[in-house]
Amino acid sequence: MKIYKIACIPGDGIGKEVVPAGQEVLAALASSSRSFGFEFENFGWGGDWYRAHGEMMPAKGLDALRQKDAILFGSAGDPDIADHITLWGLRLKICQGFDQYANVRPTRILPGIDAPLKRCRPQDLDWVIVRENSEGEYAGVGGRVHQGQPIEAATDVSMMTRAGVERIMRFAFRLAQSRPRKLLTVVTKSNAQRHAMVMWDEIALQISGEFPDVKWDKELVDAATARMVNRPATLDTLVATNLHADILSDLAAALAGSLGIAPTGNIDPERRYPSMFEPIHGSAFDIMGKGLANPVGTFWSCVMLLEHLGEVEAARTLMQAIEQVTAEPALHTRDLGGNATTQQVTQAVRDRIAAMARQPV
């Protein structure tokens, strides 16, 4: 029996509630399958670790994760610690340290979800947003001088490399090629950003020649937001820069019903390092400890984790269980207009997994 080693990093806020919920459903899948199992190791990094040690994770933290098969992450963010410290000290340290250059965010309207768009059928909103996850606007290049003085100045430099753009474009075209519609939209802002984004466009055109069966178009990022709202059915796979995709994917999740249901995978496609899977929602300290957090985003992230490990049948089972649960309004959490608790949703998903395991093959 294959045993997968999973690093679990709850992080901050409701991450401490949804990651254990994710472990529960993964364990339930393993129990019903008997062909694989999980060995979980929990890491208490985040805001509490920072208060005790002055850093969000240990200096050699990446070494502790390096031999894992995957990472399940909760959230980073603490109201008492500056956001750039919590993000750069933990999540981005892992993403960049393990060169998880492809951030993949699927979005669709799940059964039972009352999405806010009028005249939008569930089949009209079925997207995957590919986010360049290693450079661009979040490269960390820049600085501040003369702090606190009238002449203070600061820069954040968006840095793009040919190698970085080529690999994310190739990844996005390949992903689009694997989907039924074989359709890719390259999001840009080359009308105003006349250097790096022009290179981005040129490389997209270059890479498109390797995928003649993929139909692709180009859209300015501001126009892309309007298109997502007004013509969602014209989109399928999108690729965008670090900042642009960060914003667009949150909009996508809201259009599908809630940030609480949205997953993401930070992927190293070459599999040199473990990839990391997480819900896209934040730490939500206002509801922490109240049992109100929606664990569906974490469960869907676990689907992506299973797919990455090659456990396709288990991933399909978990996705079916999720859809059966979201189809029942009585099992909707507060963000979806219901009153169900985190544990009630978790138990319901576990029950569906067990029920499917009892069905004759």
Residue ranges and their predicted role:
Residues A7-E24, L29, Q149-V221:
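Glycine-rich phosphate/diphosphate-binding loop of Rossmann-like nucleotide-binding domains
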Residues Y50-T155, L243:
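N-terminal glycine-rich phosphate/adenylate-binding segment common to multiple enzyme folds
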Residues K5-I14, L72-G77, L184-S190, W300-E307:
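Short glycine-rich or small-residue beta-strand-to-loop segments that form or flank ligand, phosphate
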Residues S35-A59, M228:
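N-terminal beta-loop-helix "entrance" segment that forms/cooperates
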Residues G47-Y50, R227-A330:
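Glycine-rich phosphate/nucleotide-binding loop
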Residues G22, L26, A204, T298-L306, ...:
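Buried hydrophobic packing segments
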Residues G140-V186, S190-R194, V312, T317, ...:
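Glycine-rich phosphate/pyrophosphate-binding loop and the adjoining helix
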Residues D12-G15, D69, V130, A172, ...:
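Buried hydrophobic positions in well-ordered alpha/beta secondary-structure cores of metabolic enzymes
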